[in-house]
Amino acid sequence: EKLGIQYHVVKTQIADILKAKIKEGSFCSLCAKMRKGALTDFAKKLGCNKIAYAHHKDDFIETMLLSLFYEGQFFTFPPTKYYKESDITVIRPLIYIPEKDIIGFQNKMSFQCVKNPCPHDGNTRREYVKNLLHQLKKDNPKIKEKMFNAILKGKIYEW
C-alpha cells in the first residue's frame, strides 16, 4: 500500500475442502491446482488476461527435482504459459532471480513478508528438496546454476 500498488487478498475455502477430502499425507499438488483456479477466476472477474507468479530461480530448480524424484519425469514450469481454456497467460518474471537475492531486496526495502498459511509449511517434499540442495551446495557451490542451465538447455545427450 505504501508504494501505491493496488492488491487484493482472495479468500477461499481451499484448506477446509482439503481437510474434508484428504485424511492423511500431503496434498500440495491439489492445493496448488485449487489456488491456481481461484487466482484465475479472480483475474477473470477483474478483466485480466495475465497473472504474474513470484516463482524464482530456486522454485524452478526445486520443481524440476520434485518432478524427477516423485513423479519420474523431467519437468518444471515454463517462464510463460498461455492457458487456452481460461484465456489467461501466466508469467513468471522472477524466474532468473535466486531466492536469496529476493530476500535481500525484501530486507533492504523493509517489505513485510506474507506468512505461508499452509499447516504443512516447513515439512513438505519441497522443503526436503530445498534442504538437499543446500547440502549439495556445500560440495558444489555452483550446483544450482549448473542445474538451471541444464534445464534451460533441455537436452539429454545420446538419447
Annotate each PLM feature.
Residues E1-M64, Y70-Q73, K100-K108:
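ATP-dependent adenylation/nucleotidyltransferase module used to activate substrates
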Residues Q13-A15, Y96, P119, K153:
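Short, solvent-exposed coil/turn elements at secondary-structure transition points
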Residues K23-G25, S86-T89, K144:
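A short, structure-level motif marking secondary-structure boundaries and short turns
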Residues M34-R35, K81-S86, I156-W159:
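AMP-forming adenylation/ATP pyrophosphatase catalytic core
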Residues A38, N131-L132, K146:
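Alpha-helical elements of Rossmann-like donor-binding domains used by nucleotide-donor carbohydrate transfer enzymes
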Residues K50, D58-K138:
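Catalytic subdomain that performs nucleotidyl-dependent activation
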Residues T124, K138, K142-W159:
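A short, charged, Gly/Pro-tolerant segment at domain boundaries
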